[in-house]
């Protein structure tokens, strides 16, 4: 009887860990695109979030740019990536239904319509001189979203990196 209880408890803990790992991710900031808010090497806790719950001003993690576009230096494109499968960290500037921010996003100056279309986001780095973002690429599709940054993780409290 006691062994069955221990087994059930262990199974419950294992399921909780799996669920947490699917909902949360720790990402290491690389590059200078989010200075001064986030510095290279800092780690942030990210919660998986559906695109429809985003608001302008939130910091998000999205799948990144696969490679530099023509005219960009590859080093600058690589600096935009976080750890994991090419994550980037950016601040949401506009969500579907918001006015297109033509004055701050040159790539969208000639975009059709007056509102950000459904399924698209406008994201910007806090440090424009070192950020590959919507200023150059225009809209990013919302399906690239992983989640919202909840907080920085204190390096002293986090587990050692491998």
Name what the model sees in each region.
Residues 1-162:
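Extended hydrophobic leader/signal-anchor segments used for secretion and membrane insertion
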